[in-house]
Amino acid sequence: MSALPPVYSFPPLYTRQPNSLTRRQQISTWIDIISQYCKTKKIWYMSVDGTVINDNELDSGSTDNDDSKKISKNLFNNEDIQRSVSQVFIDEIWSQMTKEGKCLPIDQSGRRSSNTTTTRYFILWKSLDSWASLILQWFEDSGKLNQVITLYELSEGDETVNWEFHRMPESLLYYCLKPLCDRNRATMLKDENDKVIAIKVV
């Protein structure tokens, strides 16, 4: 559990503090715990209740490999000290994390969602703009500018193995690439079903 700091075993962390200033710091601590844990373990998704999902097959909907959908931990439930966070407080943490741009609420289809349709969260230990800059750097360093590259190649290709975005789910990759399109540095290509499948960066 080296990815979790000592404060994770501090019982009061799991009880919503009544004082607003204390609670603000408490929420900030939780956000740091989530971000650091997911970065260290390279986890992209968490469910609404805080369950960490180590799953790179959600985009394809594959259920053939049980190991691909292995649930490893619920961060808001610490069995070692018999403490858990209430769902009401979990929702408050997610809300603040979303405001800070450190997570992205998505629905079952992998699209950005409203509170009522959210089924899980993409965890952004880098901002969307930071991911976009890193991906742009890869295009420049690898000599791929002005070439059409599929999202699958970006996520799963051998040429990205040593880059932090390797194995990023394609539905998250879309949101990380969008800032490049907004800056007129990239164009997305879609298939006959209007799904983005590739990108050209200039």
Curated annotation (Swiss-Prot):
Membrane-topology annotation of the record: Peripheral membrane protein
Key words of the record: Cytoplasm, Endosome, Membrane, Protein transport, Transport
UniProt-listed GO biological process terms: ATP export; negative regulation of transcription by RNA polymerase II; protein targeting to vacuole; protein transport to vacuole involved in ubiquitin-dependent protein catabolic process via the multivesicular body sorting pathway; ubiquitin-dependent protein catabolic process via the multivesicular body sorting pathway
GO molecular function, one term: protein homodimerization activity
GO CC annotations, alphabetized: cytosol; ESCRT II complex
Cellular location(s): Cytoplasm; Endosome membrane
Pfam families assigned: ESCRT-II (PF05871)
Keyword Protein transport found: yes
InterPro entries associated with the record: ESCRT-II_cplx_Vps25-sub, ESCRT-II_cplx_Vps25-sub_N, WH-like_DNA-bd_sf, WH_DNA-bd_sf
Role summary: Component of the ESCRT-II complex (endosomal sorting complex required for transport II), which is required for multivesicular body (MVB) formation and sorting of endosomal cargo proteins into MVBs. The MVB pathway mediates delivery of transmembrane proteins into the lumen of the lysosome for degradation. The ESCRT-II complex is probably involved in the recruitment of the ESCRT-III complex.
Subunit organization: Homodimer. Component of the endosomal sorting complex required for transport II (ESCRT-II), which consists of 2 copies of VPS25, 1 copy of SNF8, and 1 copy of VPS36. The ESCRT-II complex interacts directly with the VPS20 subunit of the ESCRT-III complex.
Protein name: Vacuolar protein-sorting-associated protein 25
Provenance organism: Saccharomyces cerevisiae (strain ATCC 204508 / S288c)
Organism taxonomic ancestry: Eukaryota, Fungi, Dikarya, Ascomycota, Saccharomycotina
Gene: VPS25
